[in-house]
C-alpha cells in the first residue's frame, strides 16, 4: 500500500538546534529525533542533545514570528507554521504507516559549511539574511518490511553506532528511529513504550528482538571453544549495527537463517513482490537478453534495438523515375575522328565539327584500333600537343540540317566523336600541366639540396674558425 500525503505549503527553513536536540521548545511531535521524552524538554544537552541559542545568526530569529509551531513559546524560538509535517492517515495498527527514514530531511544540526561560515566575522554579518529553505523529500510513503522486533530494516541500519551519529542523536541527517513527526511506534512488552537510547550517539538502542545470551554454569558466559560456540546462528536483530547480507524484502521477514521459508505477510497486506519469490533451493532464472548477436548473424534483416540508423538493411536498389532509358552502344574509328572524312558508312558528307584537339601528331600511347569501343577510346589515347597549332581554325558549329534527328545513330556518332576529341584535348592539357609541375618540383628539390650543402659547409667552416681561435 502507498500513502501519499499532502506536502506543506512551503519548504520550511532550517530549524534551530534547540528544537532538534531536545532543547527549549522542541515538541516531540515536531522533532522526535532527539532521543528524549516529553518530560525531558527544556533540558537541552542533558539527555536529548545540546541546544543552541534560539536567536542564532545563522538560522535566523524566529522568536518574533507571529505564528508559532504547536508547543513552542515566543521565548523558545518557534519555527513557525511550516514545521509540522502533514497529518498521517489513520491506520488500524499502532505502528506508523511511514517508516522513520521516510520523513523529509529536516536539518536539525548545522552543517559543516555553516560552522565554517560562523568562524568568519564577515560571513557572520552576511548570514543575517533570510536562510535558504531546505528542500523536502517527496511525500510518498511506501510500506517497508518489519523485523521480528518491530523495527524496520532501514531503522536497523540508521540508528546503530556505525551510522555516523551526530551530537543531536540519530543518524548523520539528524533522524531518529521514531521518525520526524510520526506517531509513536508500536508498544513494547506489557504495553510500555520501548526504552530509548541514552546519551545521543553513544549507546545503540536496546533491541527487543535479540535472543537472550546463553549462560554457562553458575551464570557465567559459556566457554569460547565449547560446543555452544560452534557456528551459533546469527540473528540480525541482535546486532543492529550490522547490515543484513541481503535486502529482506517487503513484509515480515524471518531473521533465523536456519529456516528458509518466508513468513507470510500480514492479512490484508498485499505484497507485490510475493509472486517474485521463488521456492527455497531454486536458482533464479537467467535473464533473457533483448538482442543476441549470434541470433542476428543467423537471422536475416534483424538489427539491434539501439541501432537507429537502419542503414545496414536499407534497400539499395536505384529507383528510376519515368520510363527506363534504353542504352545505345556505338563504336567509332579513326576515320570518324578525322575531320577531313565524313561519317562512317558512306553517308553524305557533313560539315566537320570544330576540333579542339591541337595537332594530333604528338599523341602518346597506342593508336586506337578500328571499331574501337568507347571505353577503350577514352582510356587508350592521351595525346600531348607541343604546339597548339589547331586553335587558329576554330569555327562556329554549323547549323544542323532541317532533317537532323538528335536521336539518330548518325547524330549520336557525331556527338560521341566530339566528346572523345574533347576528352583527348583535356588529357593532353593535363599531361602538359603535370610535366610542368614535375619540372618545377625537381628544380625546387635541387635548389633545396644545394642550400643544405651550403649550410653544412658553412657550419663546418664556422666550427673550424672557432677551433682555430681557441688554439691560437
From Swiss-Prot:
Renumbered residue ranges of the record's region Disordered:
1-104, 116-280, 317-407
Q: Where does the sequence pass through the membrane?
A: 452-472
Name of this chain's protein: Uncharacterized gene A10 protein
Q: Which gene encodes it?
A: A10
Recorded topology in the membrane = Single-pass membrane protein
Q: Which domain of life is it from?
A: Viruses
Q: Which organism is it from?
A: Alcelaphine herpesvirus 1 (strain C500) (AlHV-1)
- Which intervals carry biased composition (Polar residues)? 364-379
An example of a Gene Ontology cellular component annotation for this protein is: host cell membrane
Give me the stretches of Basic and acidic residues compositional bias. Answer: 116-130, 204-217, 232-242
Amino acid at each position: 500500500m502507498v500513502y501519499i500525503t499532502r506536502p506543506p505549503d512551503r519548504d520550511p527553513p532550517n530549524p534551530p538546534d534547540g528544537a532538534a536536540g531536545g532543547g527549549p521548545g522542541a515538541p516531540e511531535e515536531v522533532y522526535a529525533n532527539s532521543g528524549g521524552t516529553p518530560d525531558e524538554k527544556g533540558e537541552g544537552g542533558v539527555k536529548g542533545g545540546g541546544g543552541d541559542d534560539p536567536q542564532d545568526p545563522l538560522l535566523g530569529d524566529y522568536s518574533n514570528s507571529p505564528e508559532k509551531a504547536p508547543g513552542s513559546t515566543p521565548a523558545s524560538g518557534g519555527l513557525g507554521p511550516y514545521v509540522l509535517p502533514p497529518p498521517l492517515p489513520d491506520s488500524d495498527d499502532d505502528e506508523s504507516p511511514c517508516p522513520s527514514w521516510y520523513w523529509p530531511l529536516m536539518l536539525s544540526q548545522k552543517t559543516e559549511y555553516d560552522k565554517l561560515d560562523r568562524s568568519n566575522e564577515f560571513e557572520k554579518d552576511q548570514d543575517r539574511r533570510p536562510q535558504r529553505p531546505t528542500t523536502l523529500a517527496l511525500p510518498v510513503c511506501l510500506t517497508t518490511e518489519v523485523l521480528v522486533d518491530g523495527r524496520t530494516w532501514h531503522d536497523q541500519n540508521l540508528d546503530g553506532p556505525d551510522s555516523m551519529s551526530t551530537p543531536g542523536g540519530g543518524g548523520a541527517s539528524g533522524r531518529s528511529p521514531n521518525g520526524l513527526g510520526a506517531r509513536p511506534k508500536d508498544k513494547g512488552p506489557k504495553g510500555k513504550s520501548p526504552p530509548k537510547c541514552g546519551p545521543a550517539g553513544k549507546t545503540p538502542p536496546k533491541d527487543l528482538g535479540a535472543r537472550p545470551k546463553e549462560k554457562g554454569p553458575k551464570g557465567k558466559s559459556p566457554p569460547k571453544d565449547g560446543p555452544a560456540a560452534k557456528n551459533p546462528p546469527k540473528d540480525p536483530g541482535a546486532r543492529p549495527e550490522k547490515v543484513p547480507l541481503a535486502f529482506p524484502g517487503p513484509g515480515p521477514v524471518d531473521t533465523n537463517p536456519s529456516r528458509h521459508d518466508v513468513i507470510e505477510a500480514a492479512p490484508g497486506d498485499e505484497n507485490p513482490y510475493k509472486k517474485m519469490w521463488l521456492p527455497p533451493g531454486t536458482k533464479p532464472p537467467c535473464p533473457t537478453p533483448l538482442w543476441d548477436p549470434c541470433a542476428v548473424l543467423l537471422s536475416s534483416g534483424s538489427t539491434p534495438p539501439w541501432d537507429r540508423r537502419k542503414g545496414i538493411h536499407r534497400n539499395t536498389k536505384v529507383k528510376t523515375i519515368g520510363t527506363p532509358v534504353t542504352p545505345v552502344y556505338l563504336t567509332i574509328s579513326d576515320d570518324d575522328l578525322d575531320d577531313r572524312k565524313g561519317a562512317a558508312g558512306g553517308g553524305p558528307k557533313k560539315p566537320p565539327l570544330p576540333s579542339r584537339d591541337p595537332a594530333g601528331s604528338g599523341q602518346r600511347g597506342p593508336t586506337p584500333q578500328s571499331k574501337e569501343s568507347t571505353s577503350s577510346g577514352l582510356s587508350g589515347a592521351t595525346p600531348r600537343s607541343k604546339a597548339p597549332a589547331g586553335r587558329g581554325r576554330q569555327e562556329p558549329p554549323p547549323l544542323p540540317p532541317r532533317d537532323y534527328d538528335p536521336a539518330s545513330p548518325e547524330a549520336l556518332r557525331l556527338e560521341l566523336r566530339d566528346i572523345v576529341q574533347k576528352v583527348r584535348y583535356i588529357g593532353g592539357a593535363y599531361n602538359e600541366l603535370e610535366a610542368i609541375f614535375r619540372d618545377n618540383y625537381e628544380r625546387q628539390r635541387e635548389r633545396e639540396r644545394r642550400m643544405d650543402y651550403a649550410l653544412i659547409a658553412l657550419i663546418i667552416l664556422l666550427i673550424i674558425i672557432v677551433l682555430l681561435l681557441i688554439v691560437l
